[in-house]
C-alpha cells in the first residue's frame, strides 16, 4: 500500500495545476468537484481512501463550509481496515456492501453490523476498525468530517500498527516507551515495526468469523447503545412516485446528528427524470453521486469579478440590478456538487440510467426546502394580485402554467417530455420572458 506523503501530495498538486490550466478553456464552476479533485491518502489492491480537496481552496464562495471535508473509503472483499482515530467528528453513509465496525472509547468496546443505507456518527478521538466480510462485494463508505483542531485540516492517527501504516508509538523516545510499557526496548521495536502490509489488509474466513463475533458491548462497562447505526433506506420515503424516491434523516430520526447540525438524504431519480427545481432556506448541501449519470443545473447571482460594483453603488432608476447565470455540470459516480442556501437547483438523470445522489446537509436544523415547480410549488401561495403584479401577466395565465405540472418533487425530465406526446400547454416562455434557464 502506498502511504500518503510528500510524493503523493506533490502529485496531487501537479494534478490540480493541470486541472486549473484546463479550466481556463471552459467556464469556471467552483461548485463542481470531479474525480481529479480527490487526493488518495492510501491505496492498494485491497482498498483505498481518498479525500476531496478543501472547499475554500477552490473558491472564496465556499468559505462558509471550509471546516468540512468529504472522503470515500473503499475496501475490497474479505479485508480488515486498521484501527485509527481522527481529530475530527465524522458522519458516514454506507453506499455499498456490509461489514462489522468496532469502536473503542474510554473503557468500552462496541461493535455493530453495517450495511447499505446505514448512517453512523463517529465522535472525534474514538478508535475505529472494521471488516468487509463479503466474499464478492466492496464496502463503499462516504464520510463527512468536521475537524476540531485546525479548520479544514484533519489527521488520522494509527496506534495499533507497525511501519506501514506507521504507529505513532514509534515517535516516542525509547526511554519513554520502555517506562510506559515496562518492557525492554528490543521487544518494543519488534512489536511496533512488524506490520508492513498497509492500512487495509486481506484476512481469512476464520479471522472474519472471529471479528464478527464481537457484535455488542465488551471489555468494560456497559452503556446505552447510542452509537448504533441508523438505516436510512428502511424508513418510509419522504416522497415517492414513478420518477423517483427521496429518503431523509434528520436529528429527530437519528439524534446523533443533532449537535453537528447535519442531516443526510438519498434521492434516487429514475432515468430521464428530474427533481423539481428547489432551494434550501439555510442549509448548504454537499451532493455526492452514489450511482448513475446525469447533470445538475443551479442558478447563481452573476458575478463580474473585478468589475463588480461596490455594495453602496446605486443603479440608475429602472435599470435591472439582479442578474443570474446558470452553472451546469455533468456528474457520475463520485462527483460532488455544492449547493449553497438560497440557490435554485435541479438534478436530471441520464437516459437508461437512474441517478442516486447522497446529500449531507450542513446547518440543517431549521432548514426549509422550497420547491419551485410541481404541485407543491411555493409560488402557488402568492395571492392573485401578487401573481399579476410580479409576472406582468393575468393571474389566470400564471396559475395555468403553475397547474400544468401534476407531479411533485420528482418530475418527468427534459428527455422524457420530448419523447412523449405533448398536449397543448401554456407557454412558459411567454410568462418568464425567456426560453430556459
Question: Where are these predicted regions, by residue range?
Answer:
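An N-terminus-focused feature that recognizes amino-terminal "leader" regions
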Residues: 1-252, 263, 280-281, 359-361, ...
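A short beta-loop-beta micro-motif enriched in histidine and acidic residues
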Residues: 62-68, 78-93, 257-262, 272-291, ...
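Conserved metal-binding segment of the jelly-roll/cupin
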Residues: 77-78, 114-134, 269-272, 328-352, ...
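N-terminal domain-start segments of secreted/luminal proteins
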Residues: 94-96, 101, 256, 306, ...
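Structural motif
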Residues: 98-100, 293-295, 354
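Active-site-adjacent structural elements in folded domains
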Residues: 249-254, 270, 321-325
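Catalytic lobes of large eukaryotic enzymes
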Residues: 290, 296-338, 356-404, 408
Amino acid at each position: 500500500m502506498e502511504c500518503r506523503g510528500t510524493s503523493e501530495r506533490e502529485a496531487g498538486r501537479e494534478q490540480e495545476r493541470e486541472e486549473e490550466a484546463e479550466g481556463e478553456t471552459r467556464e469556471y464552476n467552483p461548485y463542481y468537484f470531479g474525480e481529479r479533485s480527490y487526493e488518495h491518502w492510501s491505496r492498494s489492491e485491497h482498498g483505498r481512501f481518498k479525500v476531496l480537496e478543501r472547499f475554500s481552496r477552490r473558491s472564496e464562495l465556499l468559505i462558509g463550509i471550509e471546516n468540512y471535508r468529504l472522503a470515500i473509503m473503499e475496501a475490497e472483499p474479505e479485508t480488515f481496515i486498521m484501527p485509527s482515530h481522527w481529530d475530527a467528528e465524522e458522519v458516514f453513509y454506507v453506499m455499498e456492501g456490509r461489514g462489522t465496525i468496532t469502536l473503542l472509547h474510554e473503557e468500552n468496546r462496541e461493535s455493530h453490523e453495517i450495511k447499505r443505507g446505514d448512517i453512523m456518527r463517529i465522535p472525534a478521538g474514538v478508535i475505529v476498525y472494521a471488516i468487509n466480510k463479503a466474499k464478492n462485494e466492496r464496502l463503499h463508505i462516504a464520510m463527512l468530517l468536521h475537524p476540531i483542531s485546525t479548520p479544514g485540516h484533519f489527521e488520522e492517527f494509527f496506534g495499533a500498527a507497525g511501519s506501514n501504516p506507521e504507529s505513532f508509538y514509534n515517535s516516542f523516545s525509547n526511554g519513554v516507551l520502555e517506562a510506559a510499557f515496562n518492557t525492554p526496548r528490543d521487544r518494543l521495536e519488534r512489536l511496533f515495526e512488524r506490520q508492513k502490509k498497509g492500512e487495509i489488509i486481506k484476512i481469512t474466513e476464520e479471522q472474519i468469523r472471529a471479528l464478527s463475533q464481537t457484535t455488542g458491548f465488551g471489555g468494560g462497562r456497559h452503556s446505552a447503545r447510542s452509537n448504533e447505526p441508523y438505516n436510512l433506506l428502511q424508513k418510509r420515503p419522504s416522497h415517492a412516485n414513478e420518477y423517483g424516491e427521496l429518503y431523509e434523516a434528520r436529528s429527530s430520526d437519528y439524534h446523533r446528528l443533532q449537535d453537528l447540525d447535519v442531516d443526510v438524504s438519498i434521492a434516487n431519480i429514475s432515468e430521464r427524470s428530474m427533481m423539481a427545481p428547489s432551494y434550501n432556506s439555510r442549509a448548504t448541501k454537499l451532493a455526492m453521486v452514489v450511482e448513475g449519470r446525469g447533470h445538475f443545473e443551479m442558478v447563481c447571482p452573476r458575478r463580474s469579478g473585478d468589475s463588480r460594483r461596490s455594495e453602496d453603488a446605486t443603479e440608475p432608476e429602472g435599470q435591472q440590478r439582479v442578474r443570474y447565470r446558470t452553472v451546469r455540470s455533468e456528474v457520475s459516480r463520485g462527483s460532488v456538487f455544492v449547493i449553497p442556501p438560497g440557490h435554485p437547483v435541479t438534478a436530471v438523470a441520464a437516459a437508461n440510467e437512474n441517478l442516486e445522489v447522497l446529500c449531507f446537509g450542513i446547518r440543517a436544523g431549521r432548514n426549509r426546502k422550497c420547491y419551485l415547480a410541481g404541485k407543491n410549488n411555493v409560488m402557488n401561495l402568492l395571492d392573485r394580485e401578487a401573481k399579476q403584479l410580479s409576472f406582468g401577466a393575468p393571474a389566470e395565465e400564471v396559475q395555468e402554467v403553475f397547474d400544468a405540472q401534476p407531479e411533485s418533487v420528482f418530475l418527468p425530465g427534459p428527455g422524457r417530455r420530448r419523447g412523449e406526446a405533448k398536449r397543448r400547454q401554456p407557454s412558459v416562455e411567454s410568462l418568464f420572458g425567456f426560453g430556459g434557464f
